[in-house]
């Protein structure tokens, strides 16, 4: 039976609204008191604000992160716009610049506070683009990448320079559907058709390279079968499972934080 195009659009619109509604109840994580302690920005994948990044934000809070936690919607609201979010490179650079401006404004208003940017899937690409655009005098604390849809040979040096604690790349070779076949066919955020760094990790320069010291700020964490005990089966969305976030990501953010080092 042939599906009418209008039906597809309606179903897509309803699905998009359901995803968006899941992320609308985080106001208690964005209070002025929390913003005074620091800021964690969660960047969704190409699906936009959703159940998965809501779980990620809640898992951080439940795991003891006391900073403000916000979901930053960088994607288009057009129904069925996921491919636009993946493929519109110049638009994505513009959205990354807007995120950079948002971060700089926060740091001006809250000097010395920590800012951590956590990007899932396509949001990982936006996180890196925004970090590399930051002014040298406004570094952020860290970038945490979960199943990042960036090419493995992407040059991380500009982003690494603008992070105090570095970039943490969480990847899984079991993420073959989205970040193996998917990005090989549809492309990565940086528009290369290849398995993504969220599946195979980022390339590192050789030990003789002058960039070796800078790349020491890149930490790569491969999915481990032990993570199954916390709801993460190695799949694309497993990084957002609340139990995994509480056990692995919340302690990392807390460890990287500097709550007593305000200027």
Task: Annotate each predicted stretch with a short phrase.
Residues 2-11:
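Bacterial N-terminal signal peptides that target proteins for export
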Residues 13-17:
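Hydrophobic membrane-insertion alpha-helices, especially the h-region
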Residues 21-23:
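C-terminal motif of bacterial Sec signal peptides marking the signal peptidase cleavage site
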Residues 25-27:
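Bacterial signal peptide processing site
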Residues 29-35:
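Short, low-complexity, disordered segments immediately C-terminal to signal peptides
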Residues 38-45:
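Short beta-strand element of the alpha/beta-hydrolase
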Residues 46-197:
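Serine-dependent carboxylesterase/thioesterase catalytic core
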Residues 178-263:
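C-terminal catalytic-base region of ester-bond hydrolases, centering on the histidine
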């Amino acid at each position: 039976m042939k599906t009418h195009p209008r039906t597809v659009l309606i179903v897509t619109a309803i699905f998009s609204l359901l995803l968006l509604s899941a992320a609308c109840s985080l106001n208690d994580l964005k209070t002025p008191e929390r913003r005074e302690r620091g800021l964690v920005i969660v960047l969704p994948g190409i699906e936009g604000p959703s159940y998965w990044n809501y779980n990620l934000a809640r898992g951080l809070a439940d795991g003891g992160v006391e900073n403000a936690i916000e979901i930053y919607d960088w994607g288009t609201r057009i129904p069925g716009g996921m491919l636009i979010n993946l493929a519109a490179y110049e638009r994505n650079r513009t959205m990354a610049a807007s995120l950079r401006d948002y971060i700089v404004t926060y740091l001006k208003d809250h000097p010395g506070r920590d800012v951590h940017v956590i990007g899932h899937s396509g949001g990982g690409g936006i996180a890196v683009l925004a970090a590399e655009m930051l002014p040298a005098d406004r570094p952020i604390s860290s970038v945490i990448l979960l199943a990042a849809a960036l090419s493995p040979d992407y040059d991380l040096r500009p982003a690494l320079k603008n992070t105090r604690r570095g970039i943490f790349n969480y990847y899984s070779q079991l993420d073959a559907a989205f970040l193996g076949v998917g990005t090989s066919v549809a492309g990565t955020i940086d528009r290369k058709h290849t398995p993504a760094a969220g599946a195979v990790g980022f390339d590192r320069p050789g030990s003789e390279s002058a960039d070796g010291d800078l790349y020491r700020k890149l930490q790569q964490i491969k999915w481990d079968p032990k993570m199954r005990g916390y709801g993460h089966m190695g799949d694309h969305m497993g990084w957002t499972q609340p139990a995994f976030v509480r056990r692995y990501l919340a302690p990392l953010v807390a460890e990287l934080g500097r709550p007593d080092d305000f200027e």
